[in-house]
A protein has these predicted regions:
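Short hydrophobic/aromatic segments of transmembrane alpha-helices and their interfaces
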Residues: 12-13, 25-27, 84, 234-235, ...
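Short hydrophobic/aromatic residue motifs in ordered secondary structure
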Residues: 43, 100-101
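Short pre-active-site segment immediately N-terminal to the catalytic Zn-binding motif
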Residues: 83-93
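Soluble catalytic regions of large protease machineries
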Residues: 93-96, 102-277
Length: 277
């Protein structure tokens, strides 16, 4: 596999793709490169094309930083589907859900900074809370992963606290949290009970029509312990998110109300709402 380019590599790729595109003086490729961690060369080419299309659509002579910002959201979060008809009730649920993610992400230390929160449907999601890492990360600390579990659970917790019910909207969050917790236990040795061991060995079985299958190399008793540890980690994230959101219920209400009114909030706007400005 080809590794994803680092910040210098991304700047170089952007230079190549923008060489034939007119840019305004305020466009700084270095800043765009810094704000696109994890982007592949193809993603960056797509970003430049999208920004150029946006500028052309708005009859601009050159591409601006705003065009790049909007294009980045499109590449990262999917295309806006404003034509999708959503009931007021569903919109309200989505606002609480995304406000829950955003508030937990903002209140926990050592997490990736918030980039944007929206309740405009994008791709297959009804809303999106986007975080952007400050710099390249190749390894993750245990605490960072603990916090990530709480952030993933924030949406479901907010629904329960504010609406007193659960929806299927948290399905993907739950899947991602369970997968992360399983890796913490089975691959990264981050469970005190299970110790620094790998459970399950990956074997290539491409010829059988499978890419990778996890081969079980442990007893049924160990399998039960693994399941318990995974559950403990995910429920730990759930409990932390619930506690944070209950303590800051008023801010949660204000944040979801602001989302209902404005549909999209950037990092500064979220910060101001949390600070009560």
């Amino acid at each position: 596999t080809v590794g994803r380019p680092d910040v210098k590599g991304r700047e170089g790729i952007l230079k190549v793709h923008t060489s034939t595109v007119p840019l305004t003086d305020e466009v700084e490729l270095k800043i765009i490169a810094r704000g696109t961690p994890g982007f592949t060369g193809a993603d960056l080419a797509n970003l430049v094309n999208e920004a150029a299309l946006l500028a052309a659509r708005n009859d601009k002579k050159a591409v601006t930083m705003d065009d790049f910002e909007e294009a980045k959201d499109k590449v990262m979060m999917g295309v806006e589907r404003r034509s999708m008809v959503i009931s007021e009730k569903e919109k309200k649920t989505t606002a609480y859900h995304e406000a829950g993610h955003a508030l937990v992400a903002s209140l926990l230390p050592g997490t990736d900074p918030l980039h944007k929160v929206t309740i405009i449907p994008r791709g297959r999601a009804l809303g999106v809370t986007m975080q952007l890492p400050m710099d390249e990360q190749h390894t993750y600390q245990k605490n960072y992963l603990y916090n990530s579990l709480a952030i993933l659970m924030g949406g479901r917790c907010a629904e329960e606290i504010c609406l007193g019910e659960m929806t299927t909207g948290a399905g993907n969050d739950i899947e991602r949290a369970t997968e992360m917790a399983r890796k913490m236990v089975c691959e990264w040795g981050m469970s005190e009970k299970m110790g620094p061991l790998t459970y399950g060995s990956k074997e290539e079985q491409v010829f059988l029509g499978k890419d990778f299958s996890s081969q079980k190399n442990f007893s049924d008793q160990t399998a039960k312990l693994i399941d318990q540890e995974v559950k403990t980690l995910v429920m730990g994230g759930y409990d932390r998110a619930t506690e944070l959101l209950q303590k800051n219920r008023a801010i949660l209400e204000n944040l979801s109300q602001a989302l209902l009114e404005r549909e999209t909030l950037n990092a500064v706007e979220v910060k101001n709402i949390i600070a009560g400005k």
